[in-house]
From Swiss-Prot:
Organism: Rhodopseudomonas palustris (strain BisA53)
GO molecular function: hexosyltransferase activity
CDD domains (alphabetical): Glucan_BSP_MdoH (cd04191)
Broad enzyme group: transferase
Family to which the UniProt record says this protein belongs: Belongs to the glycosyltransferase 2 family. OpgH subfamily.
Summary of the function given for this chain in its UniProt record: Involved in the biosynthesis of osmoregulated periplasmic glucans (OPGs).
Protein name according to UniProt: Glucans biosynthesis glucosyltransferase H
InterPro entries xref list: Glucans_biosynth_gluTrFase_H, Glyco_trans_2-like, Glycosyltr_2/OpgH_subfam, Nucleotide-diphossugar_trans
Pathways involved: Glycan metabolism; osmoregulated periplasmic glucan (OPG) biosynthesis
One Gene Ontology cellular component: plasma membrane
Gene coding for it: opgH
Ranges that cross the membrane: 57-77, 89-109, 408-428, 462-482, 552-572, 573-593
């Protein structure tokens, strides 16, 4: 297999280029949906979900009880001497934030009890045992955008080989759906495709010249062209993988449950190479299964979709999830960015059940290597989630789907709310320190009004809030420790506990900076700034010191100002704010520490996870990536097409599937490129004169590219 991947035979590569990178089309209509009118449903396919209502009632009642208790205690803290306007603001912010914390705690507690009692997902997707037989046709879709091709294709090939080992490989077709705009990356993708296509059939590659509607438009284009040929699709991310066993079990579950439209798995973070990524890997593996089981337990057939590592019924997806553009200008209008939540809501609106399989192993992903990379991705997600505010009143949605929208919005707006809570607390302290109080109100009174708060009760409120935040970590640790296999995977009880402490301490230092980043993102969005579609950085987290200093300067200065201000007021205020101040003041050294690449043995020793003993699919992906990387030339993409007839033949075969340019519409980059080509005497001048955007336009124009290929 490695020999085929390394070079392939000239005959196989030539045959691949001749037959083209795509199968015959099987069109499927995907009508645009309306949020103003609910569709007519022949029957509610999710009627069996009624037993879940008592679970949801229990979750909501417990959350409400905790929120009322916390709000009452905070009121008792503030009401001594009467509640001022500032104290009223603090109370309102505290109640909203405490409700968020309470819901997270109650949901995690439900997951703890569910896993402790042996609960599995409602569909019975078995984690082990004999593999079931499947007869449905599955399309594996990998949408990519300017990614590192060798790593992306290696992950897909490792997944593909894993499926072949199950004996069900004939049921799966594999599609790489490229929206790449970098011409060098485009050519590298085609070379990787040639290398892998010669090692087996049913692997296809499609490149879109114009990436309309980004990822959702990429998937929609495939559905409209090929969707009728398949029963289900599995959407992968550029950094995700799934084992063959997991995919076969998901396909079998879709066969057994014809009323299910989507099943979401829990992707486990793997292959972390920096301390920041390692913290995410440890936290996801330690706490993720319990948290996911909790939400799956009470979400039931109204679960959510996270955009990848999920199986979807094609007919349902096509009929129900054609996304319109939102009215208004960006960032709130335009194409829907966080389309996954919306697609799940539309499927459920049409009566299809949406489930989660949180205990199914074999679903993996990687994560950004540094906090800056995480924040860059988070900025796009923030804008997409805030767009959902426009959809809360969409007709026909299930109330749990609306709750998904609200929790997605809340995951970002809580950051500026925490910031406002801190600022209001500082202002109350300043008011007490510098504003002369009115001891005797207007009118007759025997007793003065002493402005004060109850410090003892305040300490208990703080302790209770911290307890709700920390308890899910402790519950997850208990689940790991009491299970022999899990305990061994984390390196034993002591190392697991040490990992929880380490993750908690470092995460506490990075949380204030993330609060500032998210608050800034909210402000930018409200000011009308669009996130765009930037290339996501993967791999190591190496960031120049100058860049770290520039990006973290504002949080660091803010922390210093807060520290000095608190110290001028009182030592107790400084101590109360110390967790936030430390995270901000130490932002630059913490960023340097967490973005540093770790030696493999050090990472495993500090924050061990079961995936440190790499599953075969992970090690195989690394082997394939190394092979593909060794075969990648650094030559200009136009020269590679000129010098490699097989690559050129494949490229032109792919252009045959490009949609025709509408009459009267001019591509400015292509027009500029053609003008320069007219002046060029040879291909070397074309290569030298054209910028990447113009080369991309030329490589998508069959006639123009043929002209260049004929130049001396």
């Amino acid at each position: 297999m490695d020999a085929l991947i390394r070079a392939g035979s000239e005959i196989d590569a030539h045959d691949t280029a001749l037959r083209g990178p795509l199968p015959p089309e099987a069109p499927l209509a995907m009508p645009e949906q309306s949020f103003a009118a609910a569709p007519d449903r022949e029957a509610d396919r999710a009627a069996a979900a009624a037993p879940n209502e008592w679970r949801r009632l229990a979750i909501m009642l417990a959350t409400a009880a905790l929120t009322c208790a916390g709000g009452y205690e905070m009121y008792q803290v503030l009401q001594v001497g009467g509640v001022t306007i500032l104290e009223g603001i603090v109370l309102a912010l505290f109640a909203a934030l405490f409700a968020w914390v309470a819901l997270s705690f109650v949901s995690a507690l439900a997951g703890f009890v569910a896993l402790l009692s042996g609960w599995h997902d409602d569909l019975g997707v078995a984690a082990d045992g004999p593999l079931p037989a499947i007869s449905n046709r599955i399309a594996m879709l990998l949408p990519i955008y300017n990614e590192q091709p060798q790593a992306v294709f290696a992950r897909l090939q490792a997944t593909r080989e894993s499926v072949e080992l199950t004996g069900h490989g004939a049921q799966f077709d594999w599609f790489i759906l490229s929206d790449t705009t970098d011409p060098a990356v485009w050519i590298a993708e085609e070379k990787c495709y040639l290398a892998l296509a010669s090692s087996g059939e049913r692997l296809f590659y499609r490149h879109r010249q114009f990436n309309h509607a980004r990822k959702s438009g990429n998937i929609e284009d495939w559905v409209k062209r090929f969707g009728a040929g398949y029963d289900c699709i599995v959407i992968l991310d550029a950094d995700s993988m799934m084992t063959g066993e997991a995919l076969v079990r998901l396909a079998a579950a879709m066969q057994r449950h014809p009323d299910v439209g989507l099943i979401q798995t829990l992707p486990i973070v793997v292959k972390a190479r920096t301390l920041f990524a390692r913290l995410q890997q440890f936290a996801g593996r330690m706490y993720g299964p319990m948290i996911a089981s909790g939400i799956a337990w009470w979400h039931g057939s109204e679960s959510n979709y996270w955009g990848h590592n999920a199986i979807i019924r094609v007919a349902a997806f096509a009929a129900c999830t054609g996304l319109p553009s939102l009215p208004g200008r960006k960032p709130f209008g335009g194409h829907i960015l966080s389309h996954d939540f919306v697609e799940a809501a539309l499927l459920r609106r049409a009566g299809w059940r949406i489930h989660m399989a949180p205990t199914l192993p074999g679903s993996y992903e990687e994560c950004p290597p540094s906090l800056l990379d995480f924040a860059a991705r988070d900025r796009r997600w923030c804008q997409g989630n805030l767009q959902h505010a426009k959809l809360l009143k969409a007709r026909g949605l299930h109330w749990v789907s609306r709750l998904h929208f609200l929790t997605g919005i809340g995951s970002y707006i809580t950051a500026p709310m925490w910031l406002a809570f801190l600022v209001a607390g500082i202002l109350i302290s300043l008011q007490a320190q510098f504003v002369r109080p009115e001891y005797f109100p207007k009118g007759y009174s025997l007793f003065p009004d002493w402005p004060a708060q109850d410090p003892v009760r305040a300490a208990w409120v703080f302790a209770g809030t911290m307890g709700l935040l920390m308890m899910p970590k402790l519950l997850a640790l208990i689940l790991v420790v009491i299970r022999r296999e899990s305990r061994r995977g984390f390196g034993g009880a002591a190392r697991a506990a040490a990992g929880v402490v380490t993750e908690t301490l470092i995460s506490s230092l990075t949380a204030p900076v993330m609060m500032i980043f998210q608050s800034t993102a909210i402000a930018e969005i409200l000011l009308g700034r669009d996130a765009g579609w930037n290339v996501q950085h993967r791999g190591d987290g190496a960031i120049p010191l100058r860049e770290i200093a520039r990006r973290y300067a504002a949080p660091s200065w803010l922390g210093a100002v807060m520290a000095v201000s608190a110290l001028l007021v009182s030592w107790p205020l400084l101590l109360w704010m110390m967790p936030v101040i430390l995270g901000l003041v130490l932002a630059i050294p913490v960023a340097l520490l967490t973005s540093r690449t770790l030696a493999k043995h050090r990472a495993g020793a500090m924050l061990a996870t079961p995936e440190d003993a790499e599953p075969p699919i992970l090690s195989r992906a690394g082997e394939i990536a190394a092979t593909l990387r060794d075969a990648s030339p650094a030559e200009d993409p136009l020269l590679q097409l000129r010098n490699d007839p097989v690559l050129r033949e494949l490229h032109f075969a792919g252009l045959a599937h490009q949609p025709a340019r509408p009459r009267g519409r001019v591509d400015p980059a292509l027009a500029l490129a053609r003008a320069q080509i007219d002046d060029a005497a040879c291909i070397a001048e074309v290569v030298d004169w054209l910028d990447p955007r113009e080369k991309h336009a030329v490589m998508g124009s069959r006639d123009t590219l043929q002209r260049i290929m004929r130049m001396p």
